[in-house]
């Protein structure tokens, strides 16, 4: 069965594993998912990620991050632009998540960027997700 929205599936698996306090989660690999994982790592929401070759394709293994008393680093994830309703933002009107405490992941002509990186470079694009 084909997946309609692989990015939403990626975010849902992360959200579910985070809610269940799993240490890591295995996901089907794709370049865009690896780029999103890289942004999450750079922003401090996950501890690390790597790819593994499986029998039927690559897997992306994401290690989740928790605080000293097991508090979650990811409080919430939300898919913004969906296949049925795309959401775009101009460079002058980029979204801010929780007043700058969260991160918006934006697909631009320069690749995947956070809202702060896109504002610094003066580019807009498709708003993929909010993370806080």
UniProtKB/Swiss-Prot annotation:
GO BP annotations listed: translation
The family this protein is said to belong to: Belongs to the universal ribosomal protein uS8 family.
NCBIfam families named in the record: PRK00136.1
GO molecular function: rRNA binding; structural constituent of ribosome
SUPFAM superfamilies: Ribosomal protein S8 (SSF56047)
Superkingdom of origin: Bacteria
Species for this entry: Mycobacterium marinum (strain ATCC BAA-535 / M)
Pfam families hit by this protein: Ribosomal_S8
Cellular compartments per GO CC: ribonucleoprotein complex; ribosome
Role played: One of the primary rRNA binding proteins, it binds directly to 16S rRNA central domain where it helps coordinate assembly of the platform of the 30S subunit.
Assembly behavior: Part of the 30S ribosomal subunit. Contacts proteins S5 and S12.
Name assigned to this protein: Small ribosomal subunit protein uS8
Keyword check for Transmembrane: no
Keywords: Ribonucleoprotein, Ribosomal protein, RNA-binding, rRNA-binding
């Amino acid at each position: 069965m084909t997946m309609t929205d692989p990015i939403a599936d990626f975010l849902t698996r992360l959200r579910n594993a985070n809610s269940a306090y799993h240490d890591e989660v295995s996901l089907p690999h794709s370049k865009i998912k690896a780029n999103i994982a890289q942004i999450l790592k750079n922003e401090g929401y996950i501890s690390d990620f790597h790819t593994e070759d499986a029998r039927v394709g690559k897997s992306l293994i994401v290690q989740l991050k928790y605080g000293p008393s097991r508090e979650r680093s990811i409080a919430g994830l939300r898919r913004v632009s969906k296949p049925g309703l795309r959401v775009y933002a101009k460079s002058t009107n980029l979204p801010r998540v929780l007043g700058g405490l969260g991160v918006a992941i934006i697909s631009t002509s320069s690749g995947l960027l956070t809202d702060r990186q896109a504002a610094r470079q003066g580019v807009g694009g498709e708003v993929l997700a909010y993370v806080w």
